[in-house]
Regions:
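Generic surface-pattern signal
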Residues: 57, 80, 152, 169, ...
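Small-residue-enriched alpha-helical segments and adjacent helix-cap loops
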Residues: 1-124, 129, 134-138, 142, ...
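Generic structural signal of hydrophobic/aromatic residues within well-ordered alpha-helices
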Residues: 30, 75, 164, 173-180, ...
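Mobile "lid/hinge" segments at catalytic clefts and subdomain interfaces of large enzymes
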Residues: 92-170, 329, 334-382
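Gly/Thr-rich phosphate-binding loop signature of adenosyl cofactor/nucleotide-binding cores
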Residues: 181-230, 234, 271
Length: 382
């Protein structure tokens, strides 16, 4: 990021790391460095398919169903070897959830695998939460391929649905499972999600100590990240793992060094306190970092975050444009930047129809002060 980009790194909601500011001139050098480190595939088509989000600590968590490593390795191999899958649309994703202390119930994927203690997976498709196929750990790659190929056949040409939920909405999940030759049974999709209180700071996983730290809105200065990694190595850490909560986990520390790692992360500007206000807000880089951004949204997002109630989970989405890259999921309140101000969308996404248009930053703050208590109070089921 320092040598080939602009020194800025982004942590995404898909547990990916983005190197920003790469140019046509620096891209070849970046590719060479990433290949040397074993971080990308030489074939761009294969790399594009590796959109897999898995539980970040399954091998250390005694509450997890089992270690996902062998199954996910088989899944990656199938994605790499089956050339038919290269027709899948961009952003087609697979989630593999080991349950445990850091479950992925709030992370959506086109195909979702949930592990059980008996060594099997329940395979769900987006748009259907009450029906699933079942497969063993060694069958996860084959099951994912069958469901993905069924999606391609039923979706048809470029005019067809580009995401699984849209296909299920049109054709029904039963038709998709039948096309994939997958037997199904009633099963409820898990909505258990990890609390940031179980992610940030120092936590024991059996005999292992793990330190979690987050980046404000997922943005990291590469120099600070490098300093953090060097400190973790000095303290004897054995891994740094990305998570889908725009945070990372450092493992392999003893109790004294874990506390030192927490202090070092905080001193370097990373978030270790789960009550930090900006954790309640999703915000993209906005202008000028992104060409699509209409405003400097993170400045506003940081200011507005102090007006939100304490708690766990994202309440507010501030987007630089209607694409809504920082948060694809609906949010209690979304402010989408425009040339004239901000559009407000309630219980929706950045590109949805707004309830109010072209609000100034001051008007947004006034709205949050007067209506926030109502909007951000959890709705009780009737």
């Amino acid at each position: 990021a320092i040598r080939c980009g602009n020194g800025s790194i982004g942590l995404s909601a898909r547990a990916n790391l983005h190197i920003r500011g790469v140019t046509e001139q620096t891209l070849p050098d970046l590719h060479a460095r990433l290949e040397e480190a074993g971080l990308i595939d030489a074939d761009p088509e294969v790399e594009r398919l590796r959109n897999i989000v898995m539980s970040p600590i399954d091998d250390l968590d005694p509450e997890a169903a089992f270690d996902l490593g062998p199954g996910v390795a088989a899944l990656e191999t199938r994605l790499e070897e089956d050339r038919r899958l290269r027709r899948l649309p961009p952003k087609f994703s697979i989630v593999v959830d080991a349950q445990g202390r850091l479950p992925l119930g709030d992370i959506d994927g086109d195909i979702r695998f949930e592990a059980s203690r008996d060594g099997t997976f329940a395979a769900f498709v987006a748009g259907e939460d009450a029906l699933a196929a079942e497969c063993g750990s060694s069958e996860i790659g084959d099951t994912a391929a069958r469901l993905a190929l069924a999606f391609l056949r039923l979706a048809g040409d470029e005019a067809g649905p580009r995401r699984m939920w849209a296909l299920v909405e049109r054709k029904g999940a039963e038709a998709l499972f039948a096309e994939a030759a997958c037997d199904t049974k009633p099963r409820s999709r898990s909505r258990r999600r990890a609390s940031l209180r179980d992610v940030l700071g120092a936590h024991a996983y059996g005999a292992d100590l793990v330190v979690g730290a987050a980046a404000s809105f997922g943005g990291i200065e590469a120099a600070r990240f490098k300093a953090l990694i060097e400190r973790a190595r000095f303290l004897g850490a054995d891994s740094l793992r990305l998570t889908p909560w725009r945070a990372f986990l450092i493992s392999g520390l003893d109790p004294r060094d874990a506390e030192s790692m927490v202090d070092s992360a905080a001193n370097l500007g990373f978030i270790v306190d789960p009550d930090e206000p900006c954790l309640r807000v999703a915000a993209c880089p906005g202008a000028p970092a992104c060409a699509h951004g209409a405003r400097r949204v993170r400045d506003d997002a940081r200011r507005w975050s102090r007006m939100l109630p304490k708690g766990d989970g994202v309440l507010l989405h501030v987007s630089g444009c209607a694409k809504g890259c920082a948060r694809p999921a609906p949010t209690a309140a979304t402010f989408t930047a425009t040339a004239a101000g901000y559009d407000l969308i309630l219980e929706g996404r950045a590109g949805d129809s707004p309830a109010w248009r072209d609000l100034s930053s001051t008007e947004v703050a006034e709205f949050l002060a007067s209506e926030g208590a109502t909007i951000f109070t959890p709705k009780r089921p009737k």
